[in-house]
Swiss-Prot record:
Disulfide bonds: none
Lineage start: Bacteria, Bacillati, Cyanobacteriota, Cyanophyceae, Gloeobacterales
GO molecular function, one term: tRNA binding
Family, as annotated: Belongs to the universal ribosomal protein uS7 family.
Subunit structure: Part of the 30S ribosomal subunit. Contacts proteins S9 and S11.
Keyword Electron transport: no
UniProt xrefs under Pfam families: Ribosomal_S7
Gene: rpsG
Name of the protein this chain belongs to: Small ribosomal subunit protein uS7
């Protein structure tokens, strides 16, 4: 068992433009090599582009996209005897949100296109409409949990 204490989580402050903690979390996930201003500019531009294309409030589209990508259940490997079982576990809210943001950024980067602004805005709009790679990843995670439901009694 680990002797280390758990890391104290620092509170995430709301971003100045949208006054949303979720936007700050997304900025931090987008950031590469400490370039927060660049990540912020990309995210704000993507949200503006979402507003231009959909005509809806960009924060609403963003929140809906994150909600649609958030997994409710996932599988974790558990070793019992000599076998490793994929045990379905409920996902805590903070982890679910973190996974959703990670998947949105990951699949935005994989998209074909010229600029990150375009790729991110397209992924956000797709996720808000319950399509897109990030939503597919959540469904795949849920399918894995459903397939391994027989091992739920190994939960820890």
């Amino acid at each position: 068992m680990s002797r280390r204490t758990r890391a104290i989580l620092r509170p995430v402050t709301a971003d100045p433009l949208y006054a949303s903690r979720l936007v700050t979390m997304m900025t931090n996930k987008l950031m590469k090599e400490g370039k927060k201003a660049t990540a912020e500019r990309i995210l704000y531009s993507a949200l503006e582009r979402v507003q231009e294309r959909t005509g809806r409030e960009p924060l609403d589209v963003f929140n809906q996209a994150v909600l649609n990508c958030t997994p409710r259940i996932e599988v974790k490997a558990r070793r019992v005897g000599g076998a490793t079982y994929q045990v379905p576990m409920e996902v805590r809210q903070e982890r679910g949100t973190s996974l959703a943001l990670r998947w949105l950024v990951q699949f935005s980067r994989k998209r074909s296109g010229k600029s990150m602004v375009d790729k991110l805005s397209n992924e956000l709009m797709d996720a808000a409409n319950d399509t897109g790679s990030a939503v597919r990843k959540r469904e795949e995670t849920h399918r894995m949990a459903e397939a391994n439901k027989a091992f739920a009694h190994y939960r820890y």
